[in-house]
Amino acid sequence: MTEMDFDLEQIQKYELPDFETALLFSIVAKKNFLVLFDAEQRKLNDEISNEELIQKSVGDVMQKRTDFKINFKYQCINHVTDEMISEIQKCELDDYKNLETMEHVDEKGDRSANIAGVDQNVTIEFYLVEDIDRQSLADYYQLGRLMREGYIFNVQHNGIANNKKYWKLFIGTVAWKRDEYIIPDDILQLGAADKKYSHKHGQSFKLKSFSTGFEDWIRHKFWLVTTLAMPNIKPTIEVQAADDTASFSSVVITKDEAKEEEAITGSSDGAEKIISGDYKNYDNIHIQASLRRYILDIMVHIRTHRLTFNARGGGIHKNCYSNMITLSKIICIKDHKSFVVPQHVRLAAMWFLPLQLSVIDDSLKDNSILYGSKPELVRELMKRVVYVRNKQIIDMDNPLFMEALIVKSALKKIVPPV
């Protein structure tokens, strides 16, 4: 996406950000993102793995962008081990004398990305976590430790400053199946029972969230979600295994031409400027106090929305506010403005919030039952909502349609500041 168009058409289409936008925004903000794959397309293109496809996609984006020059180590994680954790804990705690965190707290107390201070020697380590929604609870704990330990700046080892700066950027993949959203048209006819659909398709009319399989705390470590279409031909890249262990493989991308490799990975002495140009002006982007209140209003409306799980705050967590401000500012920079406008906040909400939401999965969790609604009527309403949701997911190729619809309904109720 070269130019941002903020005429609400993107919001109306419930579109997710493209892969290049999600990758570049995540590099700027130092945050992780998810990639959705269509499981059926995955089967038709079994000659190329998700690992190879994402490697090539990352390399292509880095090659086109002259303002992003990086070194990157690429690792595919199938199972997080204690060895991986200890690998980034080699230095003793006393050796971290000038430790700087990746997080920046501005004068207003907002926690946001320290974007202005990243134009130094930096190495990005890309970690691909496949099928992140199907990991075990133990793997989630280990993955959380790996994410937490990976943000290190200005490491001094044995009293010698090596000025090493790096961070780990995690790319999680999630496969979704169209078959799970196919509903027969006659299911909504009078007298059609929920058991009929459940017996035929192995599932019932429950408004399950796309991220039902996730642990909330691990899902909230990812801020954007995007899609990546499967190509018809195998990409021309070579993957070499290096230092394989029993549980994960470390891979690197090799190119035939040294110039292309240098353009993607930077020089062997270390990465050059990773952030340049307008992104240096991140801290100078102005966001008015009324827009900060607008963001808080959006969060409150989603927390109390009828289709979100209010017992969990609708999925809105403490970092949503700072992440929304960060994303709004980056969108503002992309729009070549020096101040945030309501359209930037609205687009940031449509891109960021759907992945964070916790949607009710049972009619008994609907709040109106507490005030006298009949459970059977709520169940019938839920059945129709699920029917519409599933049809729209298939038509729009967006399994987060319902979550995006909830965000859009909240945006309609709130009058943006003038």
Swiss-Prot record:
Belongs to the MTC2 family. May be involved in telomere capping. This is Maintenance of telomere capping protein 2. The gene is MTC2.
